């Protein structure tokens, strides 16, 4: 027998059957072994053929098992060989004959099954015939399955039912009610149908940003086809989604992929327009399956698409369409673009209302209308790098998931009681070892308290369990109601009016009333609904922008913001007030939403607190002064340094990395940005800042829009510092502003919220700054368990030595470092100072000294 005449699948089954025979200890290879292996085959081809003939796979399998058990078993030496029986040889001979008569080049699996049914006098033939699989029935089923095609390659089985193997039936899913409802999008669905009903090039391609609902439009079309709400040309049409992964998976040799795809195309061509092929991520076809010299999937599809033999709907993003499809004009002209725009906030709210019930059933909670409106508005305002409705749906889903987790977790009051009981039990165990009267009295009191708490815990716990059970029942009823509604749609389509009436007027109203009554029960423990606050909380988690409702403590903190920051930044009341007002405007929601929270130009001599105020603001907002995004503009003096901020242009090194400014803001949209010594920056950088200050956005080198509306921009400059030192701020303001106007363009200055001139520091300010700096030193030493205090005469000497109006507060830091920290370091290293020592800073003979108390 020449195995080369058989397909790869048939060969594999024959070899598996031989192994089965050897494994069972049989020396003769019988048809029973072959049929058993064919029935166990994972591809399911033989099972499908038997079912199509009206046979029962399980009863055939049981009968074959009984027949195999009756075969003689050989043990001992010489039992390892295997011979072909006369019966199996006849099966192969008949199979080859059937294949030749049907003009097949190779013997496929179905021909082997036909060969088995042809053995009318053998055990296998009788088993099959008794179960309804006769040669006549099988021949007609195989002919129907083959649809005139022949086995002309070693992998011909893969061509059979290729559409079923490599596609997913979207209309079938719609019929089963497994697709989410599609709300709106009527114009886009109508346009898709319009293109699909053309005579040639009837292939719409849905082009839109990720998440705008391209796939949903195809699902909406499938729902309409099922509901018969389509033009006559689309009645009884099927929408099949191509599974490119399944098409490519397992293609070991060149040509296998092309063979599979060609089989799908041929099968769709034979459907004569009754099947629409949906290709999600259409751009993946370009280059798919192509090896050196081989054609890719798109080239195989082109002829069928041009002639209108295959009706296709593609979906891809704008970028991918431009990058892959437009590069191939021959492919592009076969598709008709249908542009899918992002829905508006109002449309998104309608979409969410339509989907609400599905998410309520899945999570077993209620979603309020306030949550739906918040999801649409907050996602549109704060999540700028994604698109509606996808981002709004994700917000609803995650907020519902969070509420569900909270429901399943132990309530805080019960958890606290449980911990308290454990704590008291530990204390009671310790007291049992004591014999004095006080301990006995305390033990008695603890036992009473434990008993009391246990009783309280039992009551609350049973109440919680009851509430959980009620919620489980509500979810169960909601699921039953959802399934009843799906069933109603199915029976209405199938014309079973009796069952439809039963569902519509009996089951569904009963379940609705039941659900209403169950939801009436008020609960004290568990939160069962998603509100706008939950959505705001998720937005805050995603973006880091505090959009959730402020706690009372935060409101107090914001109202006293000047005092908080004033403890750290001394002598700059105007600047602190301007910054505080900007933060309050943004958090209270009265800020213009199309520009940054605040943009300020800080002017003043060196060392007066310009950079320190930016750090203090970052610490106030984020409890972390490193949350400040700082750019030293002395690094951006060259013309080409603009690319450091927004990213290198295409073709240059570093293009993939993005810009320092744009990437930082994209990842963390809520932060303080400091441009230090802005006058040193290249003039081109001001052109970038104009866009940020005016519109609150900037486009990076990749073409992505970066949102700066949730940032505070602070620019510092030393311009006019020498004039400020001559007199007070009010008297020199005009002179300083003239210098500023000559350095910066009017359109730049005009876009700033405020230009703040910092005061020179007075001697009183210096004393306060010494206190602030000394408190930092005290905190550092406290970590080493050392305490230090500063005497008044030492403070006055530090102020006298470190005060220089021209240099501001920076000399103070140097004096503290040289006179106090250097002496401290020597004392610590010499061992004179150890843990828990008290130190004092004093002045003697115009010298600042440190000693142990």
UniProtKB/Swiss-Prot annotation:
<feature type="region of interest" description="NBD1">
    <location>
        <begin position="161"/>
        <end position="342"/>
    </location>
</feature>
<keyword id="KW-0963">Cytoplasm</keyword>
<dbReference type="InterPro" id="IPR028299">
    <property type="entry name" value="ClpA/B_CS2"/>
</dbReference>
<feature type="coiled-coil region">
    <location>
        <begin position="393"/>
        <end position="524"/>
    </location>
</feature>
<keyword id="KW-0677">Repeat</keyword>
<feature type="region of interest" description="C-terminal">
    <location>
        <begin position="761"/>
        <end position="853"/>
    </location>
</feature>
<dbReference type="GO" id="GO:0005524">
    <property type="term" value="F:ATP binding"/>
</dbReference>
<feature type="domain" description="Clp R">
    <location>
        <begin position="3"/>
        <end position="148"/>
    </location>
</feature>
<feature type="region of interest" description="NBD2">
    <location>
        <begin position="554"/>
        <end position="760"/>
    </location>
</feature>
<dbReference type="Pfam" id="PF07724">
    <property type="entry name" value="AAA_2"/>
</dbReference>
<dbReference type="GO" id="GO:0034605">
    <property type="term" value="P:cellular response to heat"/>
</dbReference>
<feature type="region of interest" description="Repeat 2">
    <location>
        <begin position="84"/>
        <end position="148"/>
    </location>
</feature>
<dbReference type="Pfam" id="PF00004">
    <property type="entry name" value="AAA"/>
</dbReference>
<dbReference type="InterPro" id="IPR041546">
    <property type="entry name" value="ClpA/ClpB_AAA_lid"/>
</dbReference>
<dbReference type="Pfam" id="PF17871">
    <property type="entry name" value="AAA_lid_9"/>
</dbReference>
<dbReference type="InterPro" id="IPR004176">
    <property type="entry name" value="Clp_R_dom"/>
</dbReference>
<comment type="subunit">
    <text>Homohexamer. The oligomerization is ATP-dependent.</text>
</comment>
<dbReference type="GO" id="GO:0016887">
    <property type="term" value="F:ATP hydrolysis activity"/>
</dbReference>
<dbReference type="Pfam" id="PF10431">
    <property type="entry name" value="ClpB_D2-small"/>
</dbReference>
<comment type="function">
    <text>Part of a stress-induced multi-chaperone system, it is involved in the recovery of the cell from heat-induced damage, in cooperation with DnaK, DnaJ and GrpE. Acts before DnaK, in the processing of protein aggregates. Protein binding stimulates the ATPase activity; ATP hydrolysis unfolds the denatured protein aggregates, which probably helps expose new hydrophobic binding sites on the surface of ClpB-bound aggregates, contributing to the solubilization and refolding of denatured protein aggregates by DnaK.</text>
</comment>
<keyword id="KW-0067">ATP-binding</keyword>
<keyword id="KW-0143">Chaperone</keyword>
<keyword id="KW-0547">Nucleotide-binding</keyword>
<dbReference type="GO" id="GO:0042026">
    <property type="term" value="P:protein refolding"/>
</dbReference>
<dbReference type="InterPro" id="IPR003593">
    <property type="entry name" value="AAA+_ATPase"/>
</dbReference>
<feature type="region of interest" description="Repeat 1">
    <location>
        <begin position="6"/>
        <end position="71"/>
    </location>
</feature>
<feature type="binding site">
    <location>
        <begin position="208"/>
        <end position="215"/>
    </location>
    <ligand>
        <name>ATP 1</name>
    </ligand>
</feature>
<feature type="binding site">
    <location>
        <begin position="604"/>
        <end position="611"/>
    </location>
    <ligand>
        <name>ATP 2</name>
    </ligand>
</feature>
<dbReference type="GO" id="GO:0005737">
    <property type="term" value="C:cytoplasm"/>
</dbReference>
<dbReference type="InterPro" id="IPR050130">
    <property type="entry name" value="ClpA_ClpB"/>
</dbReference>
<keyword id="KW-0346">Stress response</keyword>
<dbReference type="InterPro" id="IPR001270">
    <property type="entry name" value="ClpA/B"/>
</dbReference>
<dbReference type="Pfam" id="PF02861">
    <property type="entry name" value="Clp_N"/>
</dbReference>
<dbReference type="InterPro" id="IPR018368">
    <property type="entry name" value="ClpA/B_CS1"/>
</dbReference>
<feature type="region of interest" description="Linker">
    <location>
        <begin position="343"/>
        <end position="544"/>
    </location>
</feature>
<dbReference type="InterPro" id="IPR027417">
    <property type="entry name" value="P-loop_NTPase"/>
</dbReference>
<protein>
    <recommendedName>
        <fullName>Chaperone protein ClpB</fullName>
    </recommendedName>
</protein>
<dbReference type="InterPro" id="IPR036628">
    <property type="entry name" value="Clp_N_dom_sf"/>
</dbReference>
<dbReference type="InterPro" id="IPR003959">
    <property type="entry name" value="ATPase_AAA_core"/>
</dbReference>
<keyword id="KW-0175">Coiled coil</keyword>
<comment type="similarity">
    <text>Belongs to the ClpA/ClpB family.</text>
</comment>
<dbReference type="InterPro" id="IPR019489">
    <property type="entry name" value="Clp_ATPase_C"/>
</dbReference>
């Amino acid at each position: 027998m020449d195995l080369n005449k058989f397909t790869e699948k048939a060969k594999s089954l024959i070899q598996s059957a031989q192994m089965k025979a050897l494994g069972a200890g049989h020396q003769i290879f019988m048809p029973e072994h072959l049929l058993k292996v064919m029935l166990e085959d994972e591809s399911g081809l033989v099972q499908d053929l038997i079912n199509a003939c009206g046979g029962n796979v399980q009863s055939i399998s049981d009968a074959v098992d009984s027949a195999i058990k009756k075969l003689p078993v050989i043990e001992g030496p010489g039992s390892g060989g295997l011979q072909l029986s006369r019966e199996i040889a006849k099966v192969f001979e008949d199979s080859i004959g059937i294949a030749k008569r049907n003009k097949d080049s190779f013997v496929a699996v179905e021909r082997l099954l036909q060969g088995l049914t042809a053995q009318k006098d053998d055990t296998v033939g009788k088993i099959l015939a008794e179960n309804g699989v006769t040669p006549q029935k099988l021949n007609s089923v195989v002919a129907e399955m083959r649809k005139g095609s022949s086995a002309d390659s070693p992998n011909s089985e893969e061509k059979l039912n290729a559409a079923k193997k490599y596609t997913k039936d979207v209309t079938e899913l719609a019929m089963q009610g497994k697709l989410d409802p599609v709300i709106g999008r009527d114009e886009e669905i109508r346009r898709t149908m319009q293109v699909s009903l053309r005579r040639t090039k009837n292939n719409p391609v849905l082009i839109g940003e990720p998440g705008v609902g391209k796939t949903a439009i195809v699902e909406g079309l499938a729902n309409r086809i099922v509901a018969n709400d389509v033009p006559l040309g689309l009645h009884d049409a099927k929408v099949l989604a191509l599974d490119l992964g399944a098409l490519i998976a397992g293609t070991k040799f060149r040509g296998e992929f092309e063979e599979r795809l060609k089989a799908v195309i041929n099968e769709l061509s034979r459907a004569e327009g009754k099947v629409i092929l949906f290709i999600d991520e259409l751009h993946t076809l370009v280059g798919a399956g192509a090896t050196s010299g081989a054609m890719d999937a798109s080239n195989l599809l082109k002829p069928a698409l041009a002639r209108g033999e295959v009706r296709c709907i593609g979906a891809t993003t704008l970028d991918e369409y431009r990058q892959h499809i437009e590069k191939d004009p021959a492919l592009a002209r076969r598709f008709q673009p249908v542009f899918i725009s992002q829905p508006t906030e109002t449309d998104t709210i309608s979409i969410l209302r339509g989907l609400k019930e599905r998410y309520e059933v899945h999570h077993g909670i209620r979603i309020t209308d306030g949550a739906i409106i918040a999801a649409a508005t907050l996602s549109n305002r704060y999540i700028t790098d994604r698109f509606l409705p996808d981002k709004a749906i994700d917000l609803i889903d995650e907020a519902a998931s969070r509420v569900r987790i909270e429901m399943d977790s132990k309530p805080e009051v019960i958890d606290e009681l449980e911990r308290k009981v454990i704590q008291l039990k530990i204390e009671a165990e310790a007291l049992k070892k004591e014999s004095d009267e006080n301990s006995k009295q305390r033990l008695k009191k603890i036992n009473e308290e434990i008993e009391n708490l246990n009783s309280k815990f039992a009551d609350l716990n049973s109440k919680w369990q009851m509430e959980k059970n009620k919620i489980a029942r509500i979810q169960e009823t909601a699921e039953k109601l959802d399934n009843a509604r799906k069933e109603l749609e199915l029976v209405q389509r199938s014309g079973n009016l009796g069952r439809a009436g039963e569902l519509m007027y009996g089951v569904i109203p009963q379940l609705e009333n039941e659900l209403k009554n169950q939801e009436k029960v008020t609960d004290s423990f568990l939160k069962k609904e998603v509100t706008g606050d939950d959505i705001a909380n998720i937005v805050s988690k995603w973006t880091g922008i505090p959009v959730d409702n402020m706690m009372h403590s935060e409101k107090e903190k914001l109202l006293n913001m000047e005092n908080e920051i004033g403890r750290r930044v001394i002598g700059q009341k105007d600047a602190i007030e301007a910054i505080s007002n900007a933060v309050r405007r943004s958090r209270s929601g009265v800020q213009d939403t199309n520009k940054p929270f605040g943009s300020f130009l800080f002017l003043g001599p060196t060392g007066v607190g310009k950079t320190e105020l930016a750090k203090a603001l970052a610490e106030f907002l984020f409890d972390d002064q490193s949350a400040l995004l700082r750019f030293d503009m002395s690094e951006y003096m060259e013309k080409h340094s603009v690319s450091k901020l927004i990213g290198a242009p295409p073709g240059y090194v570093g293009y993939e990395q993005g810009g320092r400014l744009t990437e930082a803001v994209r990842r963390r949209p809520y932060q303080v940005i400091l441009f230090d010594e802005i006058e040193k920056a290249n003039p081109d950088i001001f052109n970038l800042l104009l866009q940020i200050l005016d519109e609150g956005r900037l486009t990076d080198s990749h073409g992505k829009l970066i949102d700066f509306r949730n940032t505070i921009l602070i620019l510092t400059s030393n311009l006019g510092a020498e004039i400020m030192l001559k007199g007070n701020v009010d008297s020199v303001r005009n002179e300083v502003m003239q210098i500023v106007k000559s350095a910066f363009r009017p359109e730049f200055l005009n876009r700033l919220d405020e230009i703040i001139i910092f005061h020179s520091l007075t001697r009183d300010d210096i004393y306060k700054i010494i206190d602030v700096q000394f408190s930092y030193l005290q905190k550092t030493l406290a970590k080493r368990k050392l305490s230090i205090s500063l005497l008044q005469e030492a403070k006055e000497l530090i102020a006298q030595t470190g005060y220089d109006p021209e240099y501001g507060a920076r000399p103070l830091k140097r004096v503290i470092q040289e006179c106090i920290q250097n002496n401290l370091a020597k004392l610590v290293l010499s061992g004179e100072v150890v843990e828990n020592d008290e130190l004092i800073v004093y002045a003697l003979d115009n010298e600042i000294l440190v000693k142990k108390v």
